[in-house]
Amino acid sequence: KKMVAEGLKPMGQEYLDILKEGFENRWIDVYENEGKRSGAYSGGSYDSHPYVLLNYRGTLDNVFTLAHEMGHSVHSYYSRKNQPYAYSDYKIFVAEVASTCNEALLIHDLLKKTSDKAMKMTLINHFLDKFKGTIYRQTMFAEFEYLMHQKAQEGKPLTAQEISSTYLELNQLYFGPDMVSDQEIALEWSRIPHFYTPFYVYQYATGFSAAIALSNKILEEGAPAVERYKTFLKGGSSMDPIDLLKTAGVDMTTSQPVQAALDVFGSLVDQMEEMI
């Protein structure tokens, strides 16, 4: 709790007070238990405070998961307090922005405070893995999905062999010639449930990019950026998601936020290479 609160200090006292309320008033089911489902999520209803499920073991990943889920919860808290029921839930396009923004602020704080080389490398590696899984991998998923729809429109039969060969080619394209792809990876598409919700996965990549851009603005500008960000959190679904993000200072109709996120990725890779 202390690490997360320290990392989120740039958000200002009002945000920290909501965070503290959640920590001290049993919003969170913290530990593993018999019969409890795995993973983590944030939920609740319009007239209740948010609820968070964790399976906390004290690992670094668990700390980031706490920051992530509390990002969802504070987003829901602001939205429900400031919008009527009909507009109180936010759209999928912005659903991962607040959670990932928290993670970006936390990694910045932890890297700033540690001088231990091994710890720095562990932190950077953790965030790079998150980056790879959220931007590169989800973009690959989205391109795969697009190609499948394109083939269907052209009247090509979507046999298991056709789908698998396309998926394998994309893996080889995205991960490059230096990565040896097992043939079995060609079948991975069949175990990814997100493909049953058409054009869902690309929003992970756009949300992550927006979150990186917003966290950078908060760290660089301070209070003015925080106020714009809180306006976004309070917006629920009262505006188009693109327009809501514009109120926070991020224009997702341009390539700039995505490029800025890729620049952060490159910078972190450079830092890791210097330490090896």
Describe the residue ranges of each PLM region:
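Contiguous, non-catalytic segments that form substrate-binding/exosite surfaces or channel walls
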Residues: K1-Y51
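Short beta-alpha connecting loops at secondary-structure transitions
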Residues: Y51-N55, N82-I92, M121-K130, H149-K151
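Conserved helix-loop functional segments at active or binding sites
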Residues: E6-D17, A40-G43, H72, S76-P84, ...
